[in-house]
Amino acid sequence: MSQPVEVDVVIIGGGLAGLSAARRLDRAGVEWLLVEGSDRLGGRVATDVIDGWRMDRGFQTLNTAYPRLPALVDIDALDMRYFTSGVLVRRCGELHRLENPLREPLATPQTLISGIGTLTDRLKFAALATRCATLPVHRLLDMPEVTTQEMLRAAGLSHRIIEEALRPFFSGVFADRSLDTSSHVAAMVLRSFTRGRIGVPAAGMAALPAAIAGPLPFPQLLIGARALAVGPGMVVTEGGEVRCRAVIVATDPAGAAALLPDRLPRPDVHSLTTFYFGADHAPIDEPILLLDGDRREIIANSVVMSNAAPEYAPGGKSLIAATVVGISAPSGASETVIRVELSRMYGVPADDWDLLSVVTVPQALPAARPPQTRLRKPIHLGDRLFVAGDHRDSPSIQGAMAGGWRTAGAVLASLGARVGV
């Protein structure tokens, strides 16, 4: 398709936020154009298929409790493969289980006698998770906003359970070990993890953006067209200038700040690195997240992806993912350290596992320290220039989808179009 000269709205960025915005604009009958600088849609959500191995661009999962998800995709059509609810924690050579108090109520006695924290700790954590799952969202966001660490301490949880289970868990979720993330964000994470099921599409996480983009008219998706400049009523791409009534910048945080330097400060971001290993046999049989409770702070979490989704590995083999907070160069030394840690965590040798890939995501998640203004930062920057993404909402897949939808609604309102779609 040749680039049009004029449309109502130009969306820059074909990730989850941009695609979600396009869906709402399309439903409203507004003329739009989406420009994506890379050779594919999906942004940070992507899957590489190499010799039969499906490796997502970093360890990512989809939560069925995300409110925006069912409005954008048919969850059944994604052919989901689910992980076991709860987590396993390796501590002092033993595996301990921390259950989801809502999803596994019959497992509560086993949970309460597990070696993670005290009995009081586990009762208090169950109360906190249940409160986050059952209170209305507005009540959660009305609570005083502090850091995640302060929220956990205020709930009466001991230093031991925070360090042995909750810091490792939240480190992988937030890509940050400090627990400085807003308590409002943490409460919403506990809410979704407790209420929903966690899994991946059988075809890989790339199936999610593909499903969101599916109903969109392909000619209005301009792939491989990099936006060079943005201004009121115009976008300049490598193909020329497009005039418009409104612009939505739905790139990653750094890209948005680069296009709107005088209007949008560059946000802090956190990075993640995922090591993918192939093995002839799974180190454990269960599809469950494994955390390091020994406070070594090397691997945030690990999971045998193929235990949940056999489609991720060829010929009955096993795919193991290990995620590290930050950027870890794929050097021989770091690989050796990761193997040693995985062997300790799983309790089996990892020497003969094949290192398949090391995926570093420099902008995995935006930082979300307090205050987070009820998880909704301003999206209209003036002159009908709008910004969308998880850096304007919650740092998550839900935040990206909801942020794109919210921004499209604001654009429709500014154009005098019908918003209630």
Q: Which functions belong to the PLM regions below?
A:
Residues 7-34:
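N-terminal Rossmann-like FAD-binding beta1-loop-alpha1 element of flavoenzymes
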Residues 60-67, 140-146, 155, 191-213, ...:
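Short beta-strand to alpha-helix junction loop
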